[in-house]
């Protein structure tokens, strides 16, 4: 092999072509400093390669895949460099020290197989006068010398150097064939060196791979934006529905509380019925003022008398179109005779106080012995004259003393629907046969006492049954018309002793 290379060099010298590789070798041999530096450089990758531990099989597989991918990436670059105007051939020649230090430095830094990236394309500066065959021979000689120059680091160079050496030892039949083989070897060496160099770049190559990853399309980004907007709209709709539900709930609760408050206020005003809340009515205001003063004049009376009497007469005065007159029965025992007469008279006058006139007064005890029909006629005349003349109230004392037949006239004045005067008040008094009347007696018992007394007085089996006489049925009809309110009266000592001061 060496003899063939020497003969090729001799032929190249004879043909007038300059051998840059030989010149660079002569310079290296003559300079001892360069030789020592070359020896140091040769030892360094050996030691580094020996000291470096073997990588795991999985790591080697991953590196192999990465190198394959990156080599495929740079294949296009290598193909483009094979054009006739290849820039690698136009670079200035390199000396032997640079050729030997380039792979050794790469082995030291990267820990991989050295390659002849710089030796393949940068070391040859061909003379344009040389023939194609001379170029092929010089390329083969240069590749063999590069592979032989560092025998100690050949174990680490791997398959790339072996391929190059075997390629350099190819048949040399014909100068044209060797030239084409040399060009193919140069291109292959350049491609392998680029692939190995890129495989050793580490993080930079990973960044380039990341850049080659597919970037999300704008359509997917728009779809994600639309999904986010839809979710936001759904959340806003949920919040609005929640707010509406809360508003309806709170509104219903507030409305219910308002209705309850109005109802309670109405009930309270109905049962309390204070005088100042009553609409303005001159007759009513005058009655309330006079009736309020009676509590001081007649002490010791039950609260039932004042409350029920005031409400009953107030309701009648407040009615715009009353359907019947207001009829009240006051009753007392024998010890309260004067108090009964005086109290009933003041109540009737209080009712008609707005007209500035007194009430009509009839005493049944004075007409007890008279004819029933006569008394009936007289009572009718007095009541009709008084009501027609503006007297809005009448008092009939000792109603139980009137002749039984004469009391039938009160059908006319106390009827529920067909009363002769509906906007008036009739106050009747009944004196019980009992000497005293307990204050603890209930209103119901008082009403029964009065009813029993009238039945005993007005119904008599010996009296004839005629139109002008009283019977049980007629008395029942009369009782239903006059017994709307029965109130007991307790005696007042001053009035019983001194009489009623009208």
From Swiss-Prot:
Question: Would you say which domain of life the source belongs to?
Answer: Eukaryota
Biological processes, Gene Ontology terms = endoplasmic reticulum organization; positive regulation of ATP-dependent activity; protein localization to nuclear envelope
Where are stretches of biased composition, namely Polar residues?
Answer: 1-14, 23-58, 192-207
The GO cellular component terms are: endoplasmic reticulum; endoplasmic reticulum membrane; nuclear envelope
Please list the tissues where expression of this protein has been recorded.
Expressed in the spinal cord and liver (at protein level).
Keywords noted in UniProt = Endoplasmic reticulum, Glycoprotein, Membrane, Nucleus, Phosphoprotein, Transmembrane, Transmembrane helix
Q: Which Pfam families match?
A: LAP1_C, LAP1_N
Q: Which residues get modified to Phosphothreonine?
A: 225
Locate the Phosphoserine modifications and list their residues. 24, 104, 131, 195
Compositional bias of type Basic and acidic residues: which residue ranges? 59-99, 109-120, 154-165
Is Nucleotide-binding included in the keywords of this UniProt record?
no
Q: Which residues lie on this side of the membrane: Cytoplasmic?
A: 1-246
Q: Which family does it belong to?
A: Belongs to the TOR1AIP family.
What is the recorded name of this protein? Torsin-1A-interacting protein 2
